C-alpha cells in the first residue's frame, strides 16, 4: 500500500504542474545537483525535495529529493498485500486453492508458491498465475496433502529482479480412511507393538474420538498415565495431545493403532508443559521433530528398542507414536520444532573443562543407558538441577545409579559437578533382578574430554581396578540378589591411580565381628563388624538357653566398617537380667558369635 500511495501522490503532483503549464525537463535533473541561485522561485514538494523556477526559463528543475524518492519507489521489491491460505483443509482429490495479491510499479515477472512438507527441508515450487488484476492463484495438488501436513509462502519477483516473500502459513488437515496409522513409515512402531512388552506411546494429530475405553491386562490390554504430582500411575480415560502413555497387551498379534478420522495440527512450534518431577510426553506431529528446552529440564529418554526392553540414552528427536520420559526440576516446558531453522540451532558452547560420560549396563534381555555423570560450568557439587533422581517406572529390571552423598542413598541417574574441581570419585550401584546374568558395563562419551582426564572403574566386590573402562568396558558375572557397588574415579593420571588403589586398601578383607566393649557391661555395649562387600546381614542376641532376645540388625548393608549398640533390652523393650548373652553375626557365607556378660 505504501508504494501505491507514493505513486498516487506523484501522479497528482505532476498533474498539478501540467495544469499550471509547467514544463518538466528531466534533462535538467542531475543527481545530487544543488538548488539554483539567483532570482529562482523554489517550491518545496511534498516528498522532501524542492522545485526551482529560474526567471530566464519556462522550465522547472526538480531537486534530488524528488529523484531519490522516485528511484526508491522503483527499486523496492513487490508488495504481497494479501495472502489467503485455508486454516482448515479437508483431504480431497481436488487439491487446495491458494491466492495472493501482489503489486509492483515495475510489473510482476513471476509469482510462485513455495511448499514445505513436514519432515523435509526442501521447498516445492508451484507457479502462480494472474487471474485478475494483481491477484495470483495456484492449486496445491492432492498428493502434497499428507498426514505430515505442510506450510507454504509466496515469492514474487518484479521485472527489475527485485524479490520479496510472505511469511509461512499453515493450517489443520482433516483425514479419513485410517490415514493416521501407526504403520506409517515415519512411525516409531511401523510393525506395531508386540505382546507382553511395556511400551511408551503417544498420538500424532488429533483423533476425532479421544476416548480410551477402560481395560485391564486380564481383559487384553491396559493403558497407564503417570501423574508427577502424586507420583502414581492411573488408568486414563481420554487421549491428551502431547502426553505419553504406558501400554501393554497380551493379544496374539501385534497391535497397530489406526484412527478412522483425525486431524494433523498446523506446523508451528508446539509447547508441551512440564510439571516438577518426571513427565511422560509425546509429539503431536506425524514426522520426527527437534525440540528446545532450558537447563532445568533433563534429557529425554524412551523405553525399548526393537524387541528388547530397557531405557535409552538421551534422545535428540521425538518420533511419532512414541512416548518419552523427561525430568523437570520445576514447572517448565519443552518446545517441539517442526522446522529447525539455522537461527534456532545455536546453543551454548560448552567450556573446555566440561565433560559428560554416559554409563551403560546391558544383559541378554534388558538394557539401561540413561545414567550420566560429568562436570558442567554452572553445576554445584551439592544437589542442584543437573542432578536427576531415578524415576518410578513400571519396568526397570536393570539399572546403575549414583549417590550424591557417598552414603547409602543411591537414587540418581544424573550427577553433574562443578568444573572448579578436576579430580573426583563417583559412587555407583548396579541393581538387577535375579536372572540378569553376564551384565556388561560400558561407557560412551557425550562430549570431548578435557586434556589429561583419565578414568578408572573400581569393582568393590572383586577388589579390582579397570583403567581401560572407556575402551573395553567390564563384564559382570551376576549371580546374586544383592546390588553391586562400583566407583568411577576421574582426574589426572596420578590421582586416578593413587585414589583407586586407596579405595581397595580401605575395603575389609573378610567378614569380622569384634568382641563387644565394654565387657562386662551395664546396661549398654558396642559391637564393631566389617563387611568386605555389600551383604544381607543379621546380628541377633541370644541367652544361654538359645532363645532369641533381640534383633540388632537384619537388612542389606554396604561394604565397610560398621558399629552397633545393644542397650540391654529385649525385643519388647524390657530390661534383661544379669547373665551371659551371645551376639551372633550371620551373612550368606559367614557366621561368627561373641560371648558377652551383663552385670548389674
Question: Where are the regions that the model predicts?
Answer:
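Residue-level detector of functionally pivotal "anchor" positions at catalytic/ligand-binding pockets or at interdomain
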Residues: 72-81, 345-347, 489-517, 532
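N-terminal exported-region signature
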Residues: 19-73, 174-367, 375-438, 443-453, ...
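Terminal processing/anchoring signals of secreted or surface-associated proteins
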Residues: 41, 245, 324, 457, ...
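Short, compositionally biased serine/threonine- and acidic-rich segments at solvent-exposed termini, linkers
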Residues: 63-72, 466-506
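Short, surface-exposed loop/turn motifs with a glycine/proline- and acidic-biased composition
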Residues: 534, 553-589
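Conserved structural position at the C-terminal beta-strand
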Residues: 156, 490, 585-587
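Glycan-association/targeting regions that enable binding to alpha-glucans and other polysaccharides
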Residues: 71-184
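Surface-exposed, proline-anchored Ser/Thr-rich loop/turn motifs
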Residues: 188, 194, 274-276, 281-285, ...
